[in-house]
Amino acid sequence: MLEFCSLYSGSSGNSLLVKTENTNILIDAGVSSKKIETALNSIDIDPSSLDGILITHEHTDHVQGLGTFAKKYDLPVFVNQKTLDAMPKQKEKISEKNINLIKIEEKFEIKDLKIKPFAIPHDAVNPCGFNIFKDNRKISIATD
């Protein structure tokens, strides 16, 4: 099983969930921490069950609730260095141990998911999308 759910999408905020039987990851946290919690609870996902947050780029509609949410639930954040540096207010709220630097085109794993970031054109410092693989299934996420 590899499932995708759009929690929020649009200029007022973006946040997506990708899940398997064993793994729950959030992609972007562009609304308040409270709104993310409410959206997850509405689909029977306990926010504390998340295994990480992937960040596509630093625009507010993709990171507004990131720092508060990641801090509250002690979640790992997967982000490239340029994007991290471009969001200092969010960065200061995230525990250093939870910052996982990623690179475009370099695969990494979160539990049973293999993830490969890819470059996307956008007016941000180093925006990326994600190809997410589980067994013979694939989901590709490209925002904006």
Language model: regions and residue ranges:
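Structured catalytic core of nucleotide-sugar glycosyltransferases
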Residues: 5-15, 56-64, 77, 88, ...
